[in-house]
From Swiss-Prot:
PANTHER family in the record: TETRAACYLDISACCHARIDE 4'-KINASE, TETRAACYLDISACCHARIDE 4'-KINASE, MITOCHONDRIAL-RELATED
Gene Ontology MF terms in the entry: ATP binding; tetraacyldisaccharide 4'-kinase activity
Cellular-component GO terms for this entry: plasma membrane
Role of this protein: Transfers the gamma-phosphate of ATP to the 4'-position of a tetraacyldisaccharide 1-phosphate intermediate (termed DS-1-P) to form tetraacyldisaccharide 1,4'-bis-phosphate (lipid IVA).
Lineage: Bacteria, Pseudomonadati, Pseudomonadota, Betaproteobacteria, Burkholderiales
Pathway per the UniProt entry: Glycolipid biosynthesis; lipid IV(A) biosynthesis; lipid IV(A) from (3R)-3-hydroxytetradecanoyl-[acyl-carrier-protein] and UDP-N-acetyl-alpha-D-glucosamine: step 6/6
Name by which UniProt lists this protein: Tetraacyldisaccharide 4'-kinase
Organism annotation: Methylibium petroleiphilum (strain ATCC BAA-1232 / LMG 22953 / PM1)
Superkingdom field: Bacteria
Gene that produces this protein: lpxK
Xref: InterPro entries: LpxK (IPR003758), P-loop_NTPase (IPR027417)
Length: 358
């Protein structure tokens, strides 16, 4: 390329450092073990209170499927939510979504609309709404968010909770726990390891399913595999209009320099997928949930490719105004859990369906 990338916000040094330390039981992890013990005691006490106190977890009048991670950082939760929503609709359900909305600037409970700024509701809830068309409500209190969702859309007959695995106040019927190739890392709790809670934490759900966003199971827990691949690429303006990505468009970027920009938890995974597709990419890794307050690539950059999670923070008019010479492409991820996973989900939800007779 003709110019080096500008001084964009890079991944937080502490975040990147700990992510590496969490893969092994080295000196840093051992030094953090006392803090992990305190954290573990607090987690165990919280879970015990919910387990022993009837009514502490609130039922909202609809089946609830919670999708989340046992580990810190991205493991494939958002594409799992989108895949589950598509499957539920094919099965005749009318799903809605509740989410905390990580990184949002607004407070309280709020419905997500296609034109809601990502910083108001969070990048992942906005992406889920745009990709699935499902109604989404964000709020730190998932019970309040679910109540608002059902008031606005009473026809909803199943609620999918995005990243609510540790939010015990919302009672759930099914838990989907997502792991990637890191598995449980070094097997220790935060901050000595990546675990938010032990991987074998008793579930408050009737059914717990484990899904591996990896080539093979990465923990001892039995689970299901998923196939993941880039579906292609699409111009940013066309992406906002709902145009699907095309493999031919992605292939057309081969043989020329492309800046790959990613503000996600595991940016290297995105870069590797682009290289696997035959692209010659220059990497620009930003912090997870990067706000894109300033566009991080120089005006001389001819082609930039981003994830969908970042695309929701890039309005077309702004990009054209601030980087008129740059073509921005979006590379969506196709995330396809194996059929046995969906069969298990259907089995768990069948007794809870409002359409069930007798």
């Amino acid at each position: 390329m003709n110019a080096d990338p500008p001084r964009a916000p890079r991944r937080a040094p502490l975040e990147a450092f700990l992510t590496q330390q969490w893969l092994r039981r080295g000196p840093v992890a051992w030094a953090l073990r006392p803090l992990a013990a305190l954290y573990g005691a607090a987690v165990a006490l919280r879970n015990r209170r919910y387990r022993l106190t009837p009514g502490r977890s609130v039922r909202v009048g609809r089946p609830v499927v919670v999708i989340g991670n046992r580990i810190a950082g991205g493991a494939g939760k958002t594409p799992t939510v989108i895949a589950v929503l598509a499957h539920l609709r094919r099965q005749g359900w009318q799903p809605g979504v509740v989410s905390r909305g990580h990184g949002r600037t607004a407070l309280g409970v709020q419905a997500v609309a296609a034109d809601t700024p990502a910083d108001v509701v969070g990048d992942e809830p906005l992406l889920i709404h745009l990709r699935s068309g499902a109604p989404v409500v964000v709020g730190r209190d998932r019970v309040a968010a679910a109540a608002a969702l059902l008031r606005a859309r009473p026809e909803i007959d199943v609620i999918v909770a995005d990243d609510g695995l540790q939010h015990r106040r919302l009672a759930r019927d099914v838990e989907v726990v997502v792991f990637d190739a890191r598995g449980a890392g070094n097997g220790w709790l935060l901050p000595a390891g990546p675990l938010r809670e032990p991987i074998d934490t008793p579930t408050g759900a009737g059914t717990a399913l484990v899904l591996y966003n990896a080539d093979r199971p990465s923990t001892p827990l039995p689970g299901y595999a998923t196939r993941r691949a880039l579906t292609g690429a699409v111009a940013l303006a066309a992406w906002w209009q709902g145009t699907p990505a095309a493999a031919a468009t992605l292939a057309s970027l081969r043989g020329r320099p492309v800046l790959a920009c990613a503000g996600i938890a595991q940016p290297q995974r995105f870069f590797e997928q682009l290289r696997h597709a035959g692209l010659d990419v220059q990497e620009q890794a930003l912090p997870d949930h990067a706000a894109f307050d300033a566009l991080p690539w120089p005006a001389a950059t001819p082609d930039v490719i981003v994830t969908e999670k970042d695309a929701v923070k890039l309005p077309v008019d702004r990009v054209r105004r601030e980087r008129p010479g740059t073509r921005v492409w979006v590379a969506p991820l196709d995330f396809s859990p194996e059929p046995a996973f969906f069969a298990a989900l259907d089995t768990a939800l069948a007794p809870l369906s409002p359409r069930r007779e007798g």
